[in-house]
Amino acid sequence: MYSTVFYTSVHPSTSAFSRKQLPLLISKDFPTELYHSLPCSRSLENGQIKKVKGVVKATIAEAPATIPPTDLKKVPQKKLKVLVAGGGIGGLVFALAAKKRGFDVLVFERDLSAIRGEGQYRGPIQIQSNALAALEAIDMDVAEDIMNAGCITGQRINGLVDGVSGNWYCKFDTFTPAVERGLPVTRVISRMTLQQNLARAVGEDIIMNESNVVNFEDDGEKVTVTLEDGQQYTGDLLVGADGIRSKVRTNLFGPSDVTYSGYTCYTGIADFVPADIETVGYRVFLGHKQYFVSSDVGGGKMQWYAFHNEPAGGVDDPNGKKARLLKIFEGWCDNVIDLLVATDEDAILRRDIYDRPPTFSWGKGRVTLLGDSVHAMQPNLGQGGCMAIEDSYQLALELDKALSRSAESGTPVDIISSLRSYESSRKLRVGVIHGLARMAAIMASTYKAYLGVGLGPLSFLTKFRIPHPGRVGGRFFIDLGMPLMLSWVLGGNGEKLEGRIQHCRLSEKANDQLRNWFEDDDALERATDAEWLLLPAGNSNAALETLVLSRDENMPCNIGSVSHANIPGKSVVIPLPQVSEMHARISYKGGAFFVTDLRSEHGTWITDNEGRRYRASPNFPTRFHPSDIIEFGSDKKAAFRVKVMKFPPKTAAKEERQAVGAA
């Protein structure tokens, strides 16, 4: 069995971007003799993976940035002493990159428990293809451990949906930009696990706990940092990786305010498995001045973020976060409400979202900044941590090049020029992605599904379900620009990763239907492997029971006011006046459910997920979908809500058996 497919093309073919950027599919059953026709064309057996890693390391070791042994006699060489303020993701990744290149590194971290337990506070983090590739270029073994611990989301459907209806607005293809460039596929990983792996790779002897950098002095030859307890340490350069409220930044450029995004964010992790877990990785649910993000994080858990437009500094009532969220998102689709309901109150956290405006000044002298300390961005693209990882690789590379030039020329290491070179190489890319993250928030805050939303006295127009012009026009531009944007964000830094061999992993392969799912919403729904239920939703005092529908095409569900045990299928009795003796039949075919009205007196009615109510045609199968309301009769007493669940509650199965007992 092939475990790794290597990308041998130096210049991958240019993608033909269409309305949907479609993935290149690699199936486990794909004939091995045809692999030469794919971008990723060479393969190795499992036992050769270690050799491959050795090749990557050897390539890095032979790069021009390495000091030739003969040059050591020409110029006395000593390790550069690199001081790093901050032991978050950016600080640790840079420390690892610098250590791998032979530098003497010391990381100052205010609270080592933040490294061990930050994941408990902020939850999992998405590491996209561009950052995973940078990690591979830094240390293949560490990157492999991190990827193995993550949950792959990039080979499933991801994108934007309408928050109320749950209908797809735009799908993102993060798979194609990765495999076409030989990059790892996007993953989500526990922040705590990520930082533990990084801290272990860096080494506890390099990370100083309870060491908060409060000041520094750059005399032109050395940099001396001062800790909160008065201790001082001297090095050849200082890297400020101490977050959005960086003390290093403040000492460099003076105090400056962070920028409030206009949104507060609630976040939580729920023990919950959505019905479409096999086909959908993450979704952004759009609404007017509020939006909701959900992502599979593996292990039967889902992470979510709820953003709401309001002033900063708000405080919730004790144990009131969940109740407030359910009120804010009242009327939204099941995918949102189910996650909120499944989350414990004490697992919900709240924080206001801030960023910093882009700046042209990243450092001075022997001091530079990295990650959030210089370009803190809103989380809407999931690129904040990814940019810090890219920064880390580039900074270590520039320092290594400076050391190599020093060895070749016999001159002192030009640290200052190498820091400015790092900053120049990163400013444009980071600035563009920072702007895109802000634009994503603006789009979310201005999204309106229907004409009349947010218009106060004219809000009655929403009942006519007239699509808002902004939604229609916005979709056109998103469909046009999203493939280009994703291609550049995910693959635009790959050429700078010196020594990294482009490759794909068969373990990251996509379902062979992924191409179809991007184009066909109906095919995506039919692929859902879950149980379909009808939950009582009527205004009757009758004890209606939950119905579990069968996906056996030979086992229809016959609904009437009396039992029909002599008819094939299950008989469901609803003893209400407007339910006819033989009212309707529910059947399953080709991955979808249909209801057929059997010429009942008062009809069978369906209200879809956008609020449109219509009568099913007699003796004609009518398709229904998740979240629809089905009414047997016109008085809304025998009404049921269509619910699709991965694991239906045990009570539902019990009630279903009672409902069909005699049948």
Curated annotation (Swiss-Prot):
GO terms for biological process: abscisic acid biosynthetic process. It catalyses: all-trans-zeaxanthin + 4 reduced [2Fe-2S]-[ferredoxin] + 2 O2 + 4 H(+) = all-trans-violaxanthin + 4 oxidized [2Fe-2S]-[ferredoxin] + 2 H2O. The keyword Thylakoid applies. SUPFAM superfamilies: FAD/NAD(P)-binding domain (SSF51905), SMAD/FHA domain (SSF49879). Induction: By drought stress; in roots. Pathway: Plant hormone biosynthesis; abscisate biosynthesis. It is found in: Plastid, Chloroplast membrane; Plastid, Chloroplast thylakoid membrane. Its cofactor is FAD. PROSITE patterns: FHA_DOMAIN. It is a peripheral membrane protein. Its main location: plastid. GO terms for molecular function: FAD binding; zeaxanthin epoxidase activity. Higher expression in leaves than in roots. It holds the Pfam family FHA. The keyword Membrane applies. Residues 1-50 form a transit peptide. FAD binds at residues 81-109, 359-372. Its EC number is 1.14.15.21. PANTHER family: PTHR46496, ZEAXANTHIN EPOXIDASE, CHLOROPLASTIC. Converts zeaxanthin into antheraxanthin and subsequently violaxanthin. Involved in the epoxidation of zeaxanthin. Plays an important role in resistance to stresses, seed development and dormancy. This is Zeaxanthin epoxidase, chloroplastic. It comes from Nicotiana plumbaginifolia (Leadwort-leaved tobacco).
